[in-house]
Every structure is written in C-alpha cells, then in structure tokens.
Amino acid sequence: MTLKVILGEHQITRTELPVGIATVSGCGAVVYCISKFWGYGAIAPYPQSGGNRVTRALQRAVIDKTKTPIETRFYPLDSLRTVTPKRAVDNGHAVSGAVRDAARRLIDESITAVGGSKFEVNPNPNSSTGLRNHFHFAVGDLAQDFRNDTPADDAFIVGVDVDYYVTEPDVLLEHMRPVVLHTFNPKKVSGFDADSPFTIKNNLVEYKVSGGAAWVHPVWDWCEAGEFIASRVRTSWKEWFLQLPLRMIGLEKVGYHKIHHCRPWTDCPDRALVYTIPQYVIWRFNWIDTELHVRKLKRIEYQDETKPGWNRLEYVTDRNELLVSIGREGEHAQITIEKEKLDMLSGLSATQSVNVRLIGMGHKDPQYTSMIVQYYTGKKVVSPISPTVYKPTMPRVHWPVTSDADVPEVSARQYTLPIVSDCMMMPMIKRWETMSESIERRVTFVANDKKPSDRIAKIAETFVKLMNGPFKDLDPLSIEETIERLNKPSQQLQLRAVFEMIGVEPRQLIESFNKNEPGMKSSRIISGFPDILFILKVSRYTLAYSDIVLHAEHNEHWYYPGRNPTEIADGVCEFVSECDAEVIETDFSNLDGRVSSWMQRNIAQKAMVQAFRPEYRDEIISFMDTIINCSAKAKRFGFRYEPGVGVKSGSSTTTPHNTQYNGCVEFTALTFEHPDAEPEDLFRLIGPKCGDDGLSRAIIQKSINRAAKCFGLELKVERYNPEIGLCFLSRVFVDPLATTTTIQDPLRTLRKLHLTTRDPTIPLADAACDRVEGHLCTDALTPLISDYCKMVLRLYGPTASTEQVRNQRRSRNKEKPYWLTCDGSWPQHPQDAHLMKQVLIKRTAIDEDQVDALIGRFAAMKDVWEKITHDSEESAAACTFDEDGVAPNSVDESLPMLNDAKQTRANPGTSRPHSNGGGSSHGNELPRRTEQRAQGPRQPARLPKQGKTNGKSDGNITAGETQRGGIPRGKGPRGGKTNTRRTPPKAGAQPQPSNNRK
C-alpha cells in the first residue's frame, strides 16, 4: 500500500526491483570512483607536475595502486674488519691492491651474512664460482669463459672496479636487487690513489698502475647528493608480451633505489664502497610528468666551465668543511682550498691582491699560492707527453707481527711475477724487529734443557762407541792442511789477513744475522764466528774426524755428508730396495735450536774426545765450551742476546754433529723396537742421514717420535707414498725402486724460483740468467720448472751481459744450487719424464690441465711481466701478516713475550725479560756455565792460555773483561766511542727482575 502511494498507480514487478537497485548502486559507485579519482587531481601544497587535473590524477592513481615495496635488509659495514688493510707482497700497487682485496672480502662476507648469493660483473680470476656476467673486453678477462647468466632471486649484483665501463647504470639496477660496488670516486682532481698516480683529462680519469695496467675511464656520480634514483625494470620475454597492451598506452614499469656510499679505507680516501637498496616498483605513464623526485645518474664533469683547461671538484670533509680541489687537466699538480676562500679570491681585481690575501690567510707555500694565482688568471699550458717508468713489482714480504715497519724493506728482486700465489716471502733483514723475533722463535721458545734417563744415556753411549769403531788415537790435521781445506774465497781472504796471528787464542763471540732467503715463516739465523782463527781451530778436528771416522766403512751406510749427488741417489735407491719401499722420511723441527747441551757433550764431544789422542782432549773441550756457551750479538744491530746452547749454524761442526744427533735418535728408536737385538746389528740398520734430513725403516714409524722426545726434540714423520715420491735433501725420488731420477721439491721450488737476492747493482737480466742456468743444470728435465727457466733465459738472454762479463763477477755462482759445487748434478733420465710430471702434480696439487696450460703459457710468453701466477688454495705462511690479514696461528700467547723481548732490545739498559738466560737452562746446569768460564776452560799446553772472563748475564748484554787483544769495550774500531745505549753495564751488575714474564 505504501509502495503504491509512492509510485502511484504503476506497480513494479519482481524483475524490475533488482535492476533498479543495481542501477542505483552502480551510479553510486561511479560517483564514488569519479570523486576518488578527482581527488587524485587535488592541488598539493608544494610544486606539482604540469598538465591538467585529469592527467595529473591519472598518473597519481596508477602510481598509488601499482606500487610494490621491496624489502631488503643489507648493511655491508657490519662486515668491515679493518680500515687499513695490508699486503705482504708489493706488486707495485700493494696498498691500493690490499684495499681492493679487502673490499672484495667485505662484500663477500656481508652478502653471505644475510643469506644472499653473489652475481658478479666481470670478476677477476680469483672469483671463479657463482653466477656472473663475464664478457671479454680486457686481456685479463680471457682467464674465464664467456658467460651471461641471469641473477637469482636472492642475488646481490657485485662490481669491483668495473662500473666505470657500464654504458648506463640501469644494466645493474634493472634486476631490482641490491647493487654493491667498489669504485674509484676521487675527491681531488689529480694525485695518487695510495700508490697509483692518476690525472683527469677531458673528464676521463687516466689511472696508471705500477706493476699493473693503465686505464682511462669516466666516473659515475654515485657519491653526489640525492639518495634516490630510478631505473627501468627487467622483464622476461613472456612478461614483455603480456604487458604489451599496457605499453601501447604509454605505461612503463619503473624501480626506485636508495643509494648509499662510504669511504672506509684510511689509506685510499678516493675509493668508495657504493651500495643501492631497491625500494619500490611502480607503473607510470611515460607521457605524463611524474611528481616523484629522484636524481639521474650521470658522468661526472670535472672541467671548470669558467676556466678552460682546468679541472675543479668540490667535496665535503669529515669535519663538514666544503673544500675545492683545482688543477690543470692532465697534470699532477693540484691544490685544495676552502670553498669560501676561493669564492672571495675569485672576486678580486688583481693577481697581486690574490697573493696578498693568501699570505694574510697564512698560505705561504710558493707552490700553493702560484697554483691559486694561475687558476685565477685561467692560465693554460701544453702538457708534454713523456714515458713514465713505474715502480717495479716487489717480492712478497714476511711481515713479523711485532714489526713497526711502515713500508716493506727487503733486499731481493723479482724477475717475473710469482709462479704460485702462495709464494715464499722475503724477510726484512734491515729491520731489527725481524732479528728479535727470529731469536725468540728460533732460540728462546725452543730452548731445550732435557736430561735423558739412564737408559737413554746408555743407548747414546753405545751409539758413540759403535760410531767411533776402532779409532782411538787420531791426530788433528795440521794448520797447513786445514788452510788448504778451507778453500772458500771468503775463508782464504780472512786467513791471509790473520796468517801471522795463527796460534793466538781466538775470540769467543758469535755475530749473528738473518739469512736473506725466502721462506714461509720467521727467517733463519746464521750464528757465525767472526774470528777465522776459531774456525781454523775447530776444523782441524772436525775434518780429521769426518775423514777417518765418519767416512769409514762401518759408517758409510748412514753418514751421507760429503757424497756427491750421484752417490747419494745410488745410496738412497739401494736403501729403499733393501727395505722393499717400507721407509719413512724424518724431518726435525728446528734441530739447531732444540739440541741440548747434554746431547752436545755426550754425543758429539764424547765421540771426538774418545777418538783423538788424550793430549788433544782439552782443546776439543775448549772449543765445545765455546760453541755451547759463547755469547752472541746481532751483527747488524749491535744488541747482545742469549744464543742458547743449541747448534750454531756458522760453525764447522753444524752438519757433522747434526747428522750424528739424527743417527743417534734413530738408533734409540731401533733399540726400542728390538730391545733384545745386538747393538751392532741395530747400528747397521740406520738409514741415510744428512744434517736434520733422514730416511728410516718404517718399522720405527711409531717409536722414532718417542725416541726424539726422550732427547727433547720434535720430529715430523711421513711414510713413503709412491704417488708423491720420496723426499731426501729437498730432492724428490720419483720411483727409488726403479730409477735414480730425482727432481727438486716442486712446491718449494715454485714458491721461490722467481726471486733473486743478488746485489741490486747487478742487472736484473744477468741475475735472472745466472739463477735459472743453475736450475737447468740440476733439473733440465723437470717439467714446469725447466720450462719456466727456459722462458726466463729466452726473454732475458738478449738483454743480459755476455758470458765473459758475468763470469768475472765473484757472485756469479751465489744462487746456483749447492750441488753444482759438489762435483756433479742429480741424475735425471728422459724416460722418466711422465713419472716426474705425475709426482709434480701430486705434490703441488695443480691438476694436469693447469700444468699443461702453464707450460704452454711459458712457451708463448713475449714479456716476462705477463701474468702467470697460479692461485693456490691454501696459504702456508706463518708468523706474519699475509694478504688476508694475520696468518693463522701467528698471534697467540707468545705475542706478549715477543713484544717484551723487542722492547728490551730497543732499550738495552732495561732488564732482560727472560729470567733463565734465554731458556738455555732451567735445571741443574747454570746458564752459559758462567762459573766454569770464570776459571777459564782447560787448555792444551802448547797453546797460549785462554783469556779469563768474568761473564755475568745482565739483561740482554753479557758483560765481561778478557785478557785477549782486541777493541776495548766502549771504543769503535777507529778509537771513537760507540753508542752509549749499547754500552754494557759493569761486570757484576745484577739483572733487574721482569714483571712481564716468568
């Protein structure tokens, strides 16, 4: 009834009612949408896009409804470990290279920390895994195959020094993934990027790397103000076809990124770490202006439009100062001035006014004021084009953890790049910290005062008796015979200088120095006796004993010093055959430093005392006293130190005595294994020994370590493996059962073959040719090693001096292999070439394809400085800083001790931190036997009495007065006073207790 009243006479049907409702709802919705859309066209309270309200509303609506946030949490500086990375090897750009390496590590670690994967653009050969975009544009790119992968969904786009060459940043940003770049973005218009010079010309950076390449490139303004940038969004082919209708009406897909940058590297302030974080993806009309404000990445224009020929760059310092760097295009001269000062100076009317104002501001440097005036006048000059000789590559440097050095200082040169990346390091022998750390690690920390048990002492006594055999009344060599045997040029020169003084008691002093040789840990110490009279005195006995006793028939099966390479090879092969290849290699750890005074007294000294006539015993004991207890000083630096009781490497007793200790340890192990056997039978089972190298029967593999510990020694044992050969005296026997062919220990050789320690005045080509010629004599058939040597000889030969000139140098054979001086070379047979190659592959862990590639590379090389380095998987460096920071196990509880010792030697007046006299004695025997030495060692009647000493340990200085002639203490060789800091305290002074070490 009510409806009828409202609608009149017309009555609606049931069908018409829903239609009416729908019509009304639709109209309402349309009105709502129109009002909502019209609301997008509202006038904002800030600047807005042009066009009419309809287009403005249309653009705003599309952006608002299609925006898709992208959430990525990434902060790479959480993985920053150091701001001053170091490189142990100076390849000409060690600092900038270390920064690049650190940046790569930082990027890798930060990506891994958030669970992402890396997608790198043209990575270097060190980065060989993962997805990548790798095109061949530089020669170095050929090291990896061409690839054009698609980034994964969790990928981080990485570029290290490659963004300059990108045609447009969108190729990196379009994937809508974080982008991380290590880039060069200078804050000055010329100068040095750490150790690499650069200039800017025509808005292009000309960057020249010492020991590397030269690069010319523009720079993107990643570090400009403005934190948001836009990019296109990459789509697949399928998406592109599906979105084609949208594109036809002018819609495009756009991504927005937030850009960050930092400069974390203290040594390279012009290097920046740039990373972008994607924020949103939207659709928008490309024919309607957008109101989203972003900056557009562009190339930096360094040219000053107001001063043709000049570059100008402004930057803000950490102290919020706005500075300006100005300099002429292509020139290295540049100056930096505060922006407000330059603005003021630019408005002056005369150059004189500019000079006056600069001086008034406190700028009195002529170079500084001249550059400002030249910029003021806009003076242009024509830059000369001249070749530049850049800093050569430097050897890898062993950098002790306690060193205070700012730059590496080594006395060695490279004549090619390293063959393997984990090459040996050269010690900084000119740094006293190097000497100090070597003393601690090779003397103090390993000092041994172990006294063996009665059973072990009895075994050692039996060994000495069997070693001496029937000899009991030997005579030493005469002075004349000994002089003839000491035939090294340096020895002959010293002997001629003291010929008239023969018979005078020699000085009791060791002068030590670091051996200038490549290695993987703290360098070895050569403890030399500077007085040739002492060497003459000792050699009379050691030479006679070796000739008659050690080379006697009953010792020839195990005593190998004095044999030539062919004899050694034959003996080793015979021993291995006798044992059916069941043999082990033995290698002592720091035998020189660990030999105890007990071993020296009861093995080496006892053997000679019992072998020579009784009238010579006092003289033998005298020189053994000196060897064991002699004081020492650093030859280069002058500080004195406790050398310990170990074997002194500069003594003529070193090799024969070490060989005897080596043999005694094996004899002890054999006795453990066969306690009921006759000693004579066990003695005949001792394997080849030479110094601290040895071969033994595998039956004592377990007991020989026990035997070594009984004497306080440490020993490494390795069982013979036919796949890797048998190593003895740094020669690898490839198959001792079938052939005498040997090769140099390949990994050890490859690590140091590129280095020379010859005098730097000798041309590098001469030094290189001399060195590789020696290796070609001993290893003419060794694969890879001989190929490398032939390459060096081929490329350096044309520029090297003539054979006659090189032969006239006394140091010609300095770096020749030792065995070339021993009447022969090691045997090698052509039919064993394949076997040699397989052993080399196993020992170096370089697969056969890579070995063949290196050999082919050596044969094709045109320049010695071409890149040849094979990347090693692991580093064997120890006690140093390597390219990745501190080498494993280099910093431990010994660090405070090393620092204490270094500080003590830097300040000789302070107390020695080693209360036990360097660790040479902790038990029953007094350090350095001062009480016995105060009375003077026993002397033979026919020699002048040895001078008396009153030696007492005082810190790191041994004070004492002697009756022998020589330079008085406190006086230099010319009568002048020496450094008072090195003057020892008076005899009898008491050492001060140390609070640092016990």
From Swiss-Prot:
Key words, A-Z: Host membrane, Host mitochondrion, Host mitochondrion outer membrane, Membrane, Nucleotidyltransferase, RNA-directed RNA polymerase, Transferase, Transmembrane, Transmembrane helix
Main location class: host cell
Keyword check for Nucleotidyltransferase: yes
Subunit: Homododecamer. Forms 2 stacked rings of 35-nm in diameter, arranged in a crown-like structure at the opening of virus-induced replication vesicles. Interacts with protein B2.
Topology within the bilayer: Single-pass membrane protein
Role played: RNA-dependent RNA polymerase, which replicates the viral genome composed of 2 RNA segments, RNA1 and RNA2. Does not need an exogenous primer. Also possesses a terminal nucleotidyl transferase (TNTase) activity. The TNTase catalyzes the addition of nucleotide to the 3'-end of plus- and minus-stranded RNAs, probably to repair the 3'-end nucleotide loss. Forms the open necked connection to the cytosol of the virus-induced replication vesicles. Mediates viral RNA1 recruitment.
Cofactor or coenzyme needed: Mn(2+)
Pfam families in UniProt: Noda_Vmethyltr
Cellular localization per UniProt: Host mitochondrion outer membrane
Protein name as annotated: RNA-directed RNA polymerase
Catalytic activity entry: RNA(n) + a ribonucleoside 5'-triphosphate = RNA(n+1) + diphosphate
Organism: Black beetle virus (BBV)
Cofactor note: For RdRP activity.
